[in-house]
């Protein structure tokens, strides 16, 4: 038999007076006036659980392991602090008689408006509990009055009763009788409160083996911050984030109603994902704004949530300059926050590709806050340089990775983010085409006018397509022309580089520089 107190099986000693040296009275309390909450949605469920947790925290005293003794009453009150969790322990002198069930109502009420619903008494071994929990070790060995007492009273909230009893049994047996995920989460939380690391690890391992659901993943991410930081819990919370990110990976298949019903931790998990498939970061931002406005009606509250919680997950450097300009003139953020975010984004856009890679390298891959990393955008980000005189014109830079180009074979396309020229919305489209004269596949580039503009709008544009090439690394002109655009129309070149597809994708192709194809479009309005 393993005689190690930290790892042995001592279930035979649980609540057995022959193997115990102390009596633990557990007072089950409940705040007066607390009503029942009926949860009708996922967000209500998550919020009610958090509210319940905060209520338990608020009705106990803040603690820094201090002692307030009253020698006349022959008792003292110990309050222990474990991160954000507070546990109140009343230690009573051994010679003091336990209170009978006939105590009056005033004695049944604590001084912080909580009532004692019931009392359980357990015979405990201080050695076993101290070996499992630094909380109990400090309680039994601090050299003060309470460490010498044979009876102590532990006050817990009614919502914690089952979990605390399971925890105490675990400290003797290294096993749990509960199997439901919600019950294991409750045990995990009280194990954190009483610093029973072995139970935290045990609960996490059991939960990791269970099928993840949206409800369970949201509850995991809504755990207290101190618990989320525990090493034994991190694999569990990482799995919860990955589950939510995978479930909402393709945003085009998710209804807006479903997104709006998610709590804050759910939205954060979605936004933190690099693999989020969405048209552009502009669309990500619009979704975030809708969510914030649906959950926070007060402007100041929206600004606080956006600035303190959600901004870290938004990839502002990959938003269009038009959208960044709107952020500066809107009240979405506090002015100082908006300026900082937009300036940082614009500076990133102007950096060389090499320096952008340096900034990306400085971001931790495991971090949930990745400001510079691209997502799996349906519409690829661009760089744009605009001129107002002598006539409206712009230079568009579109970079495509070799794998992205290979993915459009034999007949697909990649579209860029929208940009504005002459008051109209345009986009670039890289395509794999069939050259009908030579009957070969080839790489083509087109410019198109958005279909959501005015039906009568028309604008004449001079366009010039070029591509960067080895060995000079300069842009070389490939195709140019003049075209009068109307809504939904596009123009371009089916074989921009004048070579077959297999030569274009070959390793020695001069147009791929470090496996990146650099395209440029010079556009100007003909007045």
UniProtKB/Swiss-Prot annotation:
Give any single GO term for biological process. Answer: protein ubiquitination
Q: Which residues form the BTB domain?
A: 111-180
Extract the SUPFAM superfamilies matched here: POZ domain
Per UniProt, residues of the BACK domain are 233-327
Q: Which UniProt keywords apply?
A: Ubl conjugation pathway
Q: Does the keyword Coiled coil apply?
A: no
Answer whether the UniProt record assigns the keyword Transmembrane to this protein. Answer: no
A Pfam family of the record is BTB
Q: To which pathway does this protein belong?
A: Protein modification; protein ubiquitination
- Please, which domain of life does this record's source organism belong to? Eukaryota
Q: Please state what the annotation says regarding this protein's domains.
A: The BTB/POZ domain mediates the interaction with some component of ubiquitin ligase complexes.
Primary role: May act as a substrate-specific adapter of an E3 ubiquitin-protein ligase complex (CUL3-RBX1-BTB) which mediates the ubiquitination and subsequent proteasomal degradation of target proteins.
Instruction: List the protein's name.
Output: BTB/POZ domain-containing protein At4g01160
Provide the species name.
Answer: Arabidopsis thaliana (Mouse-ear cress)
């Amino acid at each position: 038999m393993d005689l190690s107190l930290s790892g042995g099986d001592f279930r035979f000693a649980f609540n057995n007076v022959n193997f115990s040296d102390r009596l633990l009275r557990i007072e089950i309390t409940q705040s007066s006036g607390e009503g029942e909450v009926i949860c009708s949605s996922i967000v209500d469920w998550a919020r009610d659980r958090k509210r319940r947790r905060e209520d338990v925290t608020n009705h106990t005293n803040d603690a820094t392991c201090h002692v307030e003794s009253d020698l006349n009453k022959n008792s003292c009150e110990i309050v222990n602090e474990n991160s954000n969790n507070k546990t109140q322990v009343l230690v009573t002198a051994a010679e003091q008689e336990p209170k009978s069930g006939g105590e009056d109502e005033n004695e049944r009420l604590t001084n912080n408006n909580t009532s004692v619903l019931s009392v359980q008494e357990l015979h405990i071994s201080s050695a076993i509990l101290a070996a499992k929990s630094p909380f109990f070790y400090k309680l039994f060995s601090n050299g003060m009055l309470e460490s010498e007492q044979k009876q102590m009273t532990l006050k817990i909230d009614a919502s914690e009763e089952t979990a605390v009893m399971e925890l105490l049994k675990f400290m003797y047996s290294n096993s749990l009788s509960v199997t439901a995920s919600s019950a294991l989460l409750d045990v995990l939380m009280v194990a954190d409160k009483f610093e029973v690391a072995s139970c935290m690890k045990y609960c996490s391992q059991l939960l990791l083996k269970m099928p993840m659901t949206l409800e369970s993943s949201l509850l995991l991410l809504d755990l207290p911050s101190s618990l989320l930081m525990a090493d034994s819990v991190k694999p569990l919370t990482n799995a919860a984030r990955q589950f939510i990110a995978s479930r909402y990976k393709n945003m085009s298949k998710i209804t807006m109603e479903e997104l709006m019903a998610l709590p804050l931790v759910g939205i954060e998990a979605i936004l933190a994902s690099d693999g989020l498939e969405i048209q552009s970061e502009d669309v990500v931002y619009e979704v975030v704004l809708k969510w914030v406005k649906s959950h926070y009606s007060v402007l100041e509250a929206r600004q606080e949530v956006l600035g303190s919680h959600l901004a870290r997950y938004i990839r502002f450097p990959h938003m269009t300059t038009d959208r960044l300009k709107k952020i500066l003139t809107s009240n979405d953020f506090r002015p100082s926050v908006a300026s900082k975010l937009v300036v940082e984004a614009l500076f990133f856009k102007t950096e060389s590709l090499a320096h952008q890679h340096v900034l990306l390298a400085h971001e931790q891959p495991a971090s949930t806050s990745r400001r510079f990393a691209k997502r799996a955008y349906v519409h690829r980000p661009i760089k744009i340089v605009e001129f107002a005189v002598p006539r409206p014109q712009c230079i568009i830079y579109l970079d495509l990775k070799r794998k992205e180009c290979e993915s459009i074979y034999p007949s697909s396309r990649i579209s860029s983010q929208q940009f504005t020229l002459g008051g109209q919305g345009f986009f670039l489209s890289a395509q794999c085409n069939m050259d009908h004269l030579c009957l070969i596949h080839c790489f083509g580039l087109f410019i198109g006018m958005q279909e959501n503009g005015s039906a009568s709008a028309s604008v004449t544009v001079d366009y010039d397509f070029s591509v960067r090439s080895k060995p000079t690394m300069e842009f070389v002109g490939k195709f140019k022309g003049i075209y009068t655009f109307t809504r939904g129309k596009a123009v371009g070149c089916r074989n921009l580089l004048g070579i077959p597809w297999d030569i274009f994708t070959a390793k020695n192709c001069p147009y791929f520089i470090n496996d990146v194809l650099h395209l440029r479009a010079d556009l100007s309005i003909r007045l």
